């Protein structure tokens, strides 16, 4: 199969991902996980090409998000752990996040106090 890409013919802007290189990088991350026992999460802010989430999910443990919509994307398309963090959360956001996230990072003691009962 010829995988040569005529970059001049692509519409711009275009995002081109070399799946072979992506897999190679994922193998490196898997090696780190295997050697250390750590979990590695996909930062969706940095890479939210959800077309590749099934592939990435073979190697990584979950996603990080900083909004309800990002968390929803990770929950629906990645299907593993969903971690969320933000400077502050509104009550409506917490209500939307609780059914779909596994971990919430609060940025202040006031936020912890405000939502302590909700997150138990």
Q: How does the language model describe each region?
A:
Residues 2, 24-28, 33-48:
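N-terminal glycine-rich anion-binding loops that anchor highly charged ligand groups
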